């Protein structure tokens, strides 16, 4: 039986699908087939040790779906694993009843989805619940929605960066649900890959500008992205175009689940992609130019076309909703409501809950707000914890308008923000997409242990 999104939000605890497979199966009725399955990979270097992983099947190392802005997409998800998947499209502003789908095991329980993506950009998909296990086993992929008017000068290159927690025997460490990880920084891996490979050499045409679509697929690690031998243009964050700027010497910080679009102009040399990890620089892949020079080049003042997002937030008339995040190690959480029962901290931890939003741990509680369609909303976030919190909104994009009491102007529109530990942040958005939606942590272990809440738009 398939459960509805509303059933998940209300009953189970909370509540998309889309596009075209880059490489994979196609059904007779035109659906692209996305199949969750086990597979054996060679993650480690210079060894015959194999690692059992999970994936959404295609013929390459990673799953990349392609769609076109404004065109209908049809996908059928089949779950060949032995557990249910609450499948979610992160960053996609689609219909609320399709953005999260419950997919039970077995071909007979396949979930179909048809909708038209409104935004072009770089998005991703993966599990909403049981996220620590399913994400760290590799059950995620990249969604590329191409612009309605194609940008022919650019060659697309996908870079999905992950850290895997590998045990001494080469298997994925099975310490899922570890309480220490839940109350702390989350599950940190010890082996880095790009597109499922260790230190891959990725070929780029020398004759054309290249668009690098980068996803941080890690459970909890912030990726400090660095480039050697190149200084790409940043052209989009979280799928939304920005005024282009250089990456620069300081690099970029990508929170879990965040995406960034970068452009390397034609004619450049080879480059190295590296990560800043606790003060060390770790190389993760090599970008190698091949072929002769050409005449394709970026136009002067190049920028991506903006998406049709609602940017007319009426701050003066906006409704402000307080959102208090509590929990984690030394987080001061004494009690919270879980499944309509008020529990003390010990009882919460016994049930795997370590975090709360507005006094509610996990999905299924009272919504943090009910909004009218088109209403301007300000979320007044109070991060009353000892940890930075990467927060993600479903079905919308928001803009930081105040940080730590200081007004912010002209900030980019994103679906994910970082609220520093023990600080406050105000986020503004237009509630223009009806349905039941979610505000959640993008640290997998935190969302599994309670850092998630819902809101409704009527």
Task: Walk through the language-model features, giving the residues of each.
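N-terminal export signals
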Residues: 1-3, 7-25
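Short tyrosine-centred short linear motifs in exposed loops/low-complexity segments
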Residues: 70-71, 109, 115-123, 207-208, ...
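Histidine- and aromatic-rich segments of cupredoxin/plastocyanin-like copper-binding domains
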Residues: 96-106, 116, 174-317, 403-415
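N-terminal edge beta-strand
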Residues: 48-66, 190-201, 352-373
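Asparagine-centered strand-capping/turn motif at beta-strand->loop junctions
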Residues: 77-81, 215-217, 381-385
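C-terminal segment of N-terminal export signals and the immediately downstream linker at the start
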Residues: 19-46, 50
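Aromatic/His-enriched, Gly/Pro-containing loop or helix-boundary segments
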Residues: 57-65, 94-123, 128-132, 248-253, ...
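Extended terminal and domain-junction accessory segments
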Residues: 25-37, 135-167, 242-388, 430-436, ...
């Amino acid at each position: 039986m398939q459960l509805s999104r509303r059933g998940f939000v209300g009953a189970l605890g909370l509540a998309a699908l889309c596009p075209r497979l880059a490489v994979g199966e196609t059904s007779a009725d035109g659906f692209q087939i996305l199949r969750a399955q086990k597979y054996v990979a060679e993650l480690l270097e210079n060894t015959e040790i194999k690692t059992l992983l999970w994936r959404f099947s295609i013929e390459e190392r990673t799953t990349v779906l392609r769609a076109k802005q404004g065109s209908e997409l049809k996908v059928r998800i089949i779950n060949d694993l032995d557990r249910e998947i609450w499948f979610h499209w992160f960053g996609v502003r689609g219909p609320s009843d399709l953005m999260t789908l419950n997919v039970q095991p077995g071909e007979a329980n396949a979930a179909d989805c048809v909708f038209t993506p409104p935004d072009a950009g770089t998005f991703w998909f993966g599990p909403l619940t049981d996220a620590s296990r399913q994400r760290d086993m590799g059950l995620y992929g990249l969604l590329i929605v191409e612009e309605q008017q194609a940008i022919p000068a650019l060659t697309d290159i996908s870079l999905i960066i992950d850290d895997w927690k590998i045990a001494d025997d080469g298997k994925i460490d099975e310490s899922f649900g570890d309480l220490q990880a839940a109350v702390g920084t989350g599950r940190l891996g010890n082996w880095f890959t790009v597109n499922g490979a260790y230190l891959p050499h990725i070929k780029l045409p020398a004759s054309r500008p290249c668009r690098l679509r980068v996803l941080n697929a890690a459970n909890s690690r912030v990726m400090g992205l660095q480039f050697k031998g190149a200084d790409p243009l940043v052209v989009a964050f979280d799928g939304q175009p920005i005024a282009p700027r250089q990456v620069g010497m300081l690099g970029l910080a990508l929170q879990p689940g965040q995406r960034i679009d970068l452009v390397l102009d034609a004619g450049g040399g080879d480059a190295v992609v590296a990560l800043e990890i606790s003060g060390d620089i770790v190389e993760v892949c090599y970008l190698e130019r091949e072929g002769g020079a050409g005449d394709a080049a970026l136009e002067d003042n190049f920028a991506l076309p903006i998406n049709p997002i609602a940017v007319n937030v009426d701050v003066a008339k906006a409704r402000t909703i307080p959102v208090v995040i509590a929990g984690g190690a030394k987080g001061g959480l004494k009690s919270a409501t879980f499944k309509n029962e008020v529990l003390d901290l010990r009882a919460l931890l016994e049930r795997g809950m370590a975090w709360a939003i507005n006094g509610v741990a996990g999905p299924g509680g009272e919504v943090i707000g009910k909004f009218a369609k088109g209403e301007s909303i300000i979320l007044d976030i109070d991060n009353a914890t000892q940890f930075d919190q990467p927060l993600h909104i479903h079905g919308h994009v928001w803009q930081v308008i105040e940080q730590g009491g200081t007004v912010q102007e002209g900030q980019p529109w994103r679906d994910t923000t970082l609220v520093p530990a023990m600080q406050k942040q105000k986020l503004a958005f237009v509630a223009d997409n009806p349905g039941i939606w979610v505000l959640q942590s993008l640290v997998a272990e935190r969302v599994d242990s309670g850092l998630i809440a819902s809101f409704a738009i009527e």
